[in-house]
Amino acid sequence: MYCRIVTGRSLKIALMSGLLLAGAFAGASVFAQEPPLTQTAKDPKLKWGPCPPFLPKGCGLAVLHGDPAKNNADVFFKVPANSIIPSHWHTSAERIVLISGELHVTYDGHKTAVLKPGTYAYGPAKLPHKAECKNAGPCILFIAFESPVDAVPSEGASKK
């Protein structure tokens, strides 16, 4: 029977290889606990909930992933065509992709941006902004929040 004694550099390599393999298997089990998800905005199974009262009538939110009361939630946000979204801000930064419609967004101190389907926009945390969904609506946006989901009306925002 052949037996090799591992010492020095060979021992270090063997230990490091073992640790890397163990880490890979441990990481794989963590990632495997959560199933993958795909979702379309037209899915009739989506559960659309209400928006805060200062936002337009007919507005809706659908939670896609995560808990909106915790960090890292993803939502669809929907407003009817020809709706005005009054000035507001979010505690969290928001990453947005317009799914449908045409949305004109104005962040305080910045030029109005015209979002068309497929357009990505980034909104920094606490930066007030307003928007208008044009007649190509409804406007449906995918929004990824880093912090819990909220919308705080800016001073002077009218309640609808």
Language-model features: locations:
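Short acidic-glycine-tyrosine-enriched beta hairpin
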Residues: 109-126
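A short, N-terminal "cap"/entry segment at the start of jelly-roll beta-barrel domains
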Residues: 24, 28-73, 156-160
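Glycine- and acidic-residue-biased ligand/ion/polar-headgroup-sensing regions
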Residues: 80-83, 90-108
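Extracellular/periplasmic catalytic domains that process cell-envelope and extracellular macromolecules
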Residues: 54-57, 68-70, 89-90, 97, ...
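Conserved short histidine dyad/triad with adjacent acidic residue
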Residues: 73-90, 124-126
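N-terminal post-signal-peptidase region of extra-cytosolic proteins
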Residues: 60-64, 75-83, 100
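Ligand-binding loop in jelly-roll beta-barrel domains
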Residues: 125-149
